[in-house]
């Protein structure tokens, strides 16, 4: 019963947001509440589940909210204007070079393994160029989202350590054969960027730029009075120090962004009224994304608290016919994206994956192959509304999450298919009939 309700809840949720009957925020909150009540849970129990889910995402929500404020202030001060001008002089107004450069930059920055950091750095560097040249921002969001999903499979990314720990396999044994698979995903992303960039070049042409972006151009989107050219070096050092601490992982991301934002605000805008105006300028974005993350916490809290996710996993495994047992690695590779789109990574890797692994072992499949297969679907996972950094990305770029999903999903599926094919070809995962 719980499994059926869980699947129905997912279908209703996706239908509501794809048809735009409800906003993502209201669908995230109301859909699980209704289905939990139908399942027989009381208001008090559902309330406790909601609070539990909110508590789990609270640190992430605070981090992202202050990260948006920090990078918003940095854009206001003009920190990124020289970099935008330099990049413009290199790409010479060619949309193709900019879009391909977006893919390369995303995957380079994503080597730190953190989606929020990757999105903030990539959008800060590239969005002004997209706005200045008229390139569709949805392309930036799509490339960054799918590219981050591919890089989430690196050994220190979000998926690989979970898969290794959930199944008790040696991380080195898991990741070694996956290196060519990850490389194929990266090449696929560059190829996709080339196709999209070529289409934008055909639409816009190569634009002649007579001067670099400045405060009066769309790239800056900020009035001269908020620029702080005399504090440029200070802001650069502060940002580099922040990024260095982020990469080191020695200090909480939430703590780092709260402190960095306060320092940046006080130094650049010591006047209290100016501080209020700058915070107000970015408050709508902060509120929209923060509320979305807390709503996602409500969804996952109820999904986990009602045990729907556990029952869904068991029912799906039981549906695999005995004669298809040897195909389980390929099935896991192709379905892991669907699973992790509909539920958080933790729920999949620690709830669903062990069941899939035990089933595969019964058919003579090595569990390390299941671990490898389970991380291939990450490009699709990173488009999920349950991933907090996804809301950060669409908020920074200025697109809706449903438009982002509609645009990027086909490219994410393509990346998963390519990576699965390469994994089968080189023997990282195997099938038998």
Swiss-Prot record:
Q: Which family does it belong to?
A: Belongs to the CitM (TC 2.A.11) transporter family.
- Induction statement: Expression is under strict control of the medium composition. Induced by citrate, via the two-component regulatory system CitT/CitS. Repressed by rapidly metabolized carbon sources like glucose, glycerol and inositol, via the carbon catabolite repression system. Is also repressed by succinate and glutamate, albeit to a lesser extent.
Entry annotated with the keyword Transport: yes
Which positions form S-S bridges?
none
Q: What is this protein called?
A: Mg(2+)/citrate complex secondary transporter
**Where exactly are the transmembrane stretches of this chain?**
2-22, 24-44, 60-80, 98-118, 131-151, 176-196, 247-267, 286-306, 324-344, 345-365, 379-399, 411-431
Topology with respect to the bilayer: Multi-pass membrane protein
UniProt GO BP? citrate metabolic process; transmembrane transport
Q: What is the lineage of its organism?
A: Bacteria, Bacillati, Bacillota, Bacilli, Bacillales
Origin: domain of life:
Bacteria
Ways its activity is controlled: The uptake activity increases with increasing Mg(2+) concentrations. Inhibited by FCCP, TCC and nigericin.
Key words, A-Z = Cell membrane, Citrate utilization, Membrane, Symport, Transmembrane, Transmembrane helix, Transport
Return the InterPro entries for the record.
Answer: Cit_transptr-like_dom, Citrate_transporter
* Localization annotation: Cell membrane
CC annotations in GO? plasma membrane
Q: Which Pfam families match?
A: CitMHS
Q: What does this protein do?
A: Proton motive force-driven secondary transporter that mediates the transport of citrate complexed to Mg(2+). Cotransports at least two protons per Mg(2+)-citrate complex. Can also transport citrate in complex with Ni(2+), Mn(2+), Co(2+), and Zn(2+).
GO MF, one term, reads: symporter activity
Q: Does the keyword Mitochondrion apply?
A: no
The record's section on NCBIfam families has: citMHS (TIGR00784)
């Amino acid at each position: 019963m719980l499994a059926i309700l869980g699947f129905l809840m997912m279908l209703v949720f996706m239908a509501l947001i794809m048809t735009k009957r409800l906003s993502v925020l209201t669908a995230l909150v109301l859909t699980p509440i209704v289905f939990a009540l139908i399942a027989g849970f009381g208001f008090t129990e559902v309330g406790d589940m909601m609070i539990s889910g909110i508590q789990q995402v609270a640190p992430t929500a605070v981090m992202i909210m202050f990260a948006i404020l920090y990078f918003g202030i940095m854009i206001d001060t003009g920190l990124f204007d020289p970099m935008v001008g330099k990049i413009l002089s290199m790409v010479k107004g060619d949309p193709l070079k900019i879009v391909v450069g977006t893919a390369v930059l995303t995957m380079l920055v994503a080597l730190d393994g953190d989606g929020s950091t990757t999105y903030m750095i990539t959008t800060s560097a590239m969005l002004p160029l997209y706005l200045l040249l008229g390139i569709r921002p949805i392309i930036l969001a799509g490339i960054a989202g799918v590219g981050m999903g591919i890089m989430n499979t690196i050994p220190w990314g979000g998926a690989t350590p979970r898969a290794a720990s959930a199944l008790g396999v040696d991380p080195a044994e898991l990741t070694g054969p996956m290196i060519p698979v990850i490389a194929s995903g990266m090449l696929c992303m560059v190829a996709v960027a080339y196709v999209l960039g070529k289409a934008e070049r055909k639409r816009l042409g190569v634009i002649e730029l007579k001067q670099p972006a400045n405060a009066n151009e769309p790239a800056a989107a900020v009035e001269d009075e908020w620029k702080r050219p005399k504090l440029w070096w200070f802001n650069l050092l502060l940002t580099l120090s922040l990024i260095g601490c982020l990469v080191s992982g020695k200090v909480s991301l939430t703590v780092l962004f709260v402190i960095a934002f306060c320092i940046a605000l006080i130094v650049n805008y010591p006047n209290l009224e100016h501080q209020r105006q700058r915070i107000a300028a970015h408050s709508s974005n902060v509120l929209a994304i923060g509320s979305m993350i807390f709503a996602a916490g409500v969804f996952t809290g109820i999904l986990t608290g009602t045990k729907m996710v556990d029952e869904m996993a068991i029912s799906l495994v039981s549906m695999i016919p005995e004669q298809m047992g040897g195909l389980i690695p390929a099935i896991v590779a192709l379905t892991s994206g669907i699973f992790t789109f509909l539920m958080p990574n933790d729920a999949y890797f620690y709830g669903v994956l062990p069941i899939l692994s035990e089933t595969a072992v019964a058919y003579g499949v090595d569990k390390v192959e299941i671990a490898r297969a389970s991380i291939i679907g990450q490009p699709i996972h990173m488009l999920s509304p349950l991933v907090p950094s996804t809301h950060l990305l669409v908020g920074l770029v200025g697109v809706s999450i449903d438009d982002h999903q509609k645009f990027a999903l086909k490219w994410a599926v393509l990346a998963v298919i390519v990576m699965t094919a390469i994994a089968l070809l080189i023997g990282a995962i195997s099938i038998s009939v």
